Amino acid sequence: MADNRVVVYKGPGEVAVEDIEYPKLEVPEEVASAMGMTVEAPHAVILRIVATNICGSDQHMVRGRTTAPVGQTLGHEITGEVVEKGNDVQFIDVGDICSVPFNIACGRCRNCKERKTGVCLNVNPARAGS
């Protein structure tokens, strides 16, 4: 898909806009194998991004104040239209517009169980980015 573009981190002070493949509604094979799971993603959705934000963490990576793997996609504060959904997604439908929280909450800690995912005790197990 020629219009599926992302901003990719190339190194301190360097980013590029690149075309990428349209995503599949599945867990990448290498991740599924490493985690001992199937590639099926019944709880997932695919969004067509309608707006994104340049976050401070993106700027820190680009300016060399923090590290980032070369090739990482930037932009993790997004709003998008649901274009595809897994068969176990219950409260979101194709065509819905939704915003994605900037943090990756664990869903298991005390705060998450109290629906305070914005202050998850185990937030962002990896790093910011898509």
Language-model features, listed with the residues they occupy:
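Glycine-rich beta-strand-centered segment in the early N-terminal region that forms part
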Residues: 26-53, 62-110
